[in-house]
């Protein structure tokens, strides 16, 4: 259990890290619409953007700060006073300050020494704190940083006034075992303040690493709806929340039933479709075609489902196709209000399998056509 807490907080960065996805650019009204949906869903902290990027970005963050009623609104800021000023002018509740701590970033991106990085942390965190807002400090590329120096950077930020700290896996190189070690290492050496974890998905490990961090002492999960974000994306809000709830038995403030609609909204405004096999919110997440599976699910859904689809706003789908069996056909016919006689079931099953190999999707309209042809005594040796 993270830091003795039973409730894990959710920090959503869909409007900042998510929007950094190539090809995505949200208008002010679109950012506000997503922010309001995040607030309604129960997100604890909303990173609304990066105020120093542009006047429009600052305006959007300021509007979100005004309109959001429950969640804390956050702006990202580099370790500079001008970035802090821009964030403060956006009337945020929290400023998220970051600076890289890995040697590769210090040398090739910032061109500074470790000592200079510590000096900037002390100076700018203290300056930001003078605005009277909460301060979150991130050590960018923490997971490729020297551990002793990393701990020193966090201690410097905390002593300068940081209220919370974040551990970013900036290029997604962690494994669960390494993440467990890192979180324990930091917990043993730092004061017991809230610790965030921010995982990227370059190796497909973002959710697993986030959940592992929570199991080993992190209090706050930084996430993005639909796994969106730059490169391979970030830990998916819906997957982390479901895992925390169903697998760890811990609570969040998220209304689970809002997950599907939130996913759909973000997909629409980002212009990026949700993969059908996406966990929790994908169209296929609770879809069943294989006859054995359908039989089990119709008798007891938990035979092939780890959670109830309606609990996360999704729904169960029984799909007719190449792998369907009699139970699927009977269920589908009853849903149409058609009495499933043995002859009709056999006819439909044969038709479905023939159509499937022709890549024909057997939806409700096609199924009705199959039934009509059966009633007229016609064969199914044609493509619908």
Curated annotation (Swiss-Prot):
The keyword Transferase applies. A divalent metal cation binds at residues 17, 198, 200, 234. InterPro entries: 2-IPM_HCS-like, AIPM/Hcit_synth_CS, Aldolase_TIM, LEU1_arch, LeuA/HCS_post-cat, PYR_CT. It catalyses: 3-methyl-2-oxobutanoate + acetyl-CoA + H2O = (2S)-2-isopropylmalate + CoA + H(+). The keyword Amino-acid biosynthesis applies. Belongs to the alpha-IPM synthase/homocitrate synthase family. This is Probable 2-isopropylmalate synthase.
